[in-house]
């Protein structure tokens, strides 16, 4: 039985967020094809994720003990390390990821839990795991010159790669706010892609 961590980074409802419309469909299909897997939903806004304080940083860099697994910050890093698969439902905001997702990434990118330092430098500890990023965007960022502006999916892929997650897929619904676009068709295409990836994820 695999453990999937479903990470939601948007204050909107499942019905009003176009990212969540796709991600909820992904999860629905995933459940159908992986009925024995455990799915843990982590709504970052409901979790009360915040920016790290000086005290938080001191705790993160302190030696880890058995009690660290219950620390209000470190528990998220341990949870992330224990999962086998990750689904990130995070829209593009101003070319990047929502700030709350960056704050969460600061919670989970912890030396000794999700990566470690060696004589050769940093080494990810999450090898063999897989992730998918589901993202809705108002514009189009697949081709130049706008692809150079895209720092949401690129950052998430990079930081997960740093932690050892090399199997990374992306499902995007782009051009949703461009005048004259067929939004219904764009969403339909993204939902079909989500179905296909969910089946074998």
From Swiss-Prot:
Keywords: Flavoprotein, FMN, NAD, Oxidoreductase
Catalytic activity line of the entry: 2 a quinone + NADH + H(+) = 2 a 1,4-benzosemiquinone + NAD(+); N,N-dimethyl-1,4-phenylenediamine + anthranilate + 2 NAD(+) = 2-(4-dimethylaminophenyl)diazenylbenzoate + 2 NADH + 2 H(+)
Annotated InterPro entries: Flavodoxin_fold (IPR003680), Flavoprotein-like_sf (IPR029039), FMN-dep_NADH:Q_OxRdtase_AzoR1 (IPR050104), NADH:quinone_OxRdtase_FMN_depd (IPR023048)
Note accompanying the cofactor annotation: Binds 1 FMN per subunit.
Gene3D superfamilies, A to Z: 3.40.50.360
EC category name: oxidoreductase
Cofactors, names only: FMN
Binding residue positions for FMN: 92-95
Pfam family name, one: Flavodoxin_2
SUPFAM superfamilies: Flavoproteins
HAMAP family linked: Azoreductase_type1
Family: Belongs to the azoreductase type 1 family.
Protein name: FMN-dependent NADH:quinone oxidoreductase
């Amino acid at each position: 039985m695999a453990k999937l961590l479903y990470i939601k980074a948007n204050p909107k409802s499942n019905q009003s967020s176009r990212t969540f419309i796709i991600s909820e469909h992904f999860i629905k299909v995933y459940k159908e094809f992986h009925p024995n897997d455990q799915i843990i939903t982590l709504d970052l806004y409901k979790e009360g994720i915040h920016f790290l304080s000086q005290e938080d940083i001191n705790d993160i860099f302190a030696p880890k003990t058995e009690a660290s697994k219950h620390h209000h910050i470190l528990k998220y890093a341990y949870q992330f390390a224990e999962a086998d698969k990750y689904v990130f439902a995070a829209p593009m905001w101003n070319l990047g990821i929502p700030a709350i997702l960056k704050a969460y990434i600061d919670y989970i990118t912890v030396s000794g839990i999700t990566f470690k330092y060696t004589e050769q430098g940093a080494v990810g500890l999450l090898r063999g795991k897989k992730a998918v990023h589901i993202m809705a965007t108002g514009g189009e960022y697949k081709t130049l010159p706008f692809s150079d502006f895209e720092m949401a999916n690129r950052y998430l892929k990079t930081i997960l790669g740093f932690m050892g997650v090399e199997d990374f897929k992306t499902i995007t619904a782009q051009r949703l706010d461009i005048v004259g676009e067929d939004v219904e068709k764009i969403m339909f295409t993204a939902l079909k892609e989500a179905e296909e990836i969910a089946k074998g994820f």
